[in-house]
Amino acid sequence: MASEVRFEPGLYRGAAGYYERFRLPYPGAMIADLARRAAPSGHGRLLDLACGTGQLAFPLRGWFAEVWAVDAEPGMTEVVRAKAAAAGAAGIRAVTVSAEDLRAGPGRFELIVIGNAFHRLRRPLVAERVRGWLEPGGWLALCWSTSPWAGPRDWQQTLDRLLRRWQDVLGTSGRVPPGWDRPGRTVGAVPVRDVARRR
């Protein structure tokens, strides 16, 4: 699809430790609201696509018997494995594969979450596969946050200019394509809601 935004492969290579340490967590109220809406059985599966270091998988794990934490970056899934071992979270399965290449049977998941990553995926393909992976009555949640660094305040504008200047100096300004932060409100021709349920 010509209008799709493409990200450089390996964009997060080597960043897992920093991502785990500095990535802001999702608010507890959001996690609780998501669990309330999806009303998991406690016996089902959660799929966290493009999971990073498990910012959604870990806080949601208590509502599921099994959690698949999937990310294309090996460093991210290594951190997930280490965190799961340290927490004694045997139900968390870290899988190193892209969302587009994941092989999962139909109707396997009660809830699928994608946190701050749907814009980086091949959206129509992933949306189609997600629909098949959800069990009847299952839910898809596209979780999003805004950057605390972006905004109209003087310090935010100054930081933005500084980051852009360093991107130019380091030759990385083209790694993130323009428009990545405006994913739109549709997937193909399907409107996106806050939380979608498979009927």
Enumerate the language-model features and the residues they cover:
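N-terminal, positively charged/glycine-rich alpha-helical extensions of SAM-dependent methyltransferases
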Residues: M1-A15
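Class I SAM-dependent methyltransferase Rossmann-like catalytic core
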Residues: R13-L24
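Conserved alpha-helix/loop element of class I SAM-dependent methyltransferases that forms part
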Residues: L24-G44
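Class I SAM-dependent methyltransferase SAM/SAH-binding core
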Residues: L47, T53-D101
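A short acidic, Gly/Pro-enriched loop at the edge of an enzyme's catalytic core
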Residues: R103-I112
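Residues lining the SAM
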Residues: I114-G115, C143
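A short, conserved alpha-helix within the catalytic core of class I
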Residues: L121-V130
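Conserved catalytic/acceptor-binding region of the Class I
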Residues: R131, E135-R199
